[in-house]
Amino acid sequence: MKNDVISPEFDENGRPLRRIRSFVRRQGRLTKGQEHALENYWPVMGVEFSEAPVDFATLFGREAPVTLEIGFGMGASLVAMAKARPEQNFLGIEVHSPGVGACLASAHEEGVENLRVMCHDAVEVLHKMIPDNSLSMVQLFFPDPWHKARHNKRRIVQVPFAELVLSKLKLGGVFHMATDWEAYAEHMLEVMSSIDGYKNLSESNDYVPRPESRPVTKFEQRGHRLGHGVWDLMFERVK
């Protein structure tokens, strides 16, 4: 796996462009298990960043609906979803290599073959590698809420990002978000509702019950015990 997780963008004069990122690089120390997984399973399941669009049929060796998960953490729920739906293809993106290693180890242990992972900036991957009208589902679960007001602009869910996701979804594809931060849920709802081309799948036009397809994480279980809420939002591409 290459170490160039984040490639700067350049202007017409070749100068690097600065753009606000929605994450902080916290690479952390790899455990021996994570290191072993990166060395041994990355060649099979890992995808290097490329400037060229990916061909999903070639990448997965078959034609099947593709779900993209952005920021899969340690990968437990992503692996569980891929194992539960072997008829679908899953691509996960995570910027922190310990999480990528943990996901690879878990996928290998569970015998999951319909999963590929990347260690790169998801926005750049969407721009450069994901073909338009190619995804059946985009998942964004528990992104950093950047709860301080001065940091709100760092939240990944902003109008340009949501419009980018829209362009990558097939007609009828769904953008599924979840957060345990109510103010961020309200922000997500406001952003998504402002974009022509999305339809809110909530009967009350706000949030949906957690679908069975999204596993409950340990983090989420702990939150429930402490009385914390979780908000799911699902928006379908309709035009």
UniProtKB/Swiss-Prot annotation:
For the keyword Transferase, the answer is: yes
Disulfides per UniProt = none
Q: Which residues bind S-adenosyl-L-methionine?
A: E69, E94, D121, D144
Q: Note the Pfam families from the entry.
A: Methyltransf_4
Where substrate binds, per the record, is at K148, D180, T217, K218, F219, E220
- One GO cellular component, as annotated: tRNA methyltransferase complex
Say yes or no: keyword Transferase present.
yes
Return the InterPro entries for the record.
SAM-dependent_MTases_sf (IPR029063), tRNA_(Gua-N-7)_MeTrfase_Trmb (IPR003358), tRNA_methyltr_TrmB_bact (IPR055361)
Check the record and name the PROSITE patterns matching this protein: SAM_MT_TRMB
**Which GO terms fall under molecular function for this chain's record?**
tRNA (guanine(46)-N7)-methyltransferase activity
Q: What class of enzyme is it?
A: transferase
Keyword line: Methyltransferase, S-adenosyl-L-methionine, Transferase, tRNA processing
Catalytic activity annotated for this protein?
guanosine(46) in tRNA + S-adenosyl-L-methionine = N(7)-methylguanosine(46) in tRNA + S-adenosyl-L-homocysteine
EC number of the protein: 2.1.1.33
Associated pathway? tRNA modification; N(7)-methylguanine-tRNA biosynthesis
Q: Tell me the segments the record calls region Interaction with RNA.
A: 150-155
The positions flagged as active site in the entry are D144
Which PANTHER family does the UniProt record give? 3-DEOXY-D-MANNO-OCTULOSONIC-ACID TRANSFERASE/TRNA GUANINE-N 7 - -METHYLTRANSFERASE, PENTACOTRIPEPTIDE-REPEAT REGION OF PRORP DOMAIN-CONTAINING PROTEIN
Assembly and partners?
Monomer.
Per the similarity annotation, which family is this?
Belongs to the class I-like SAM-binding methyltransferase superfamily. TrmB family.
UniProt function note? Catalyzes the formation of N(7)-methylguanine at position 46 (m7G46) in tRNA.
**Record protein name field:** tRNA (guanine-N(7)-)-methyltransferase
Q: Which organism is it from?
A: Salmonella choleraesuis (strain SC-B67)
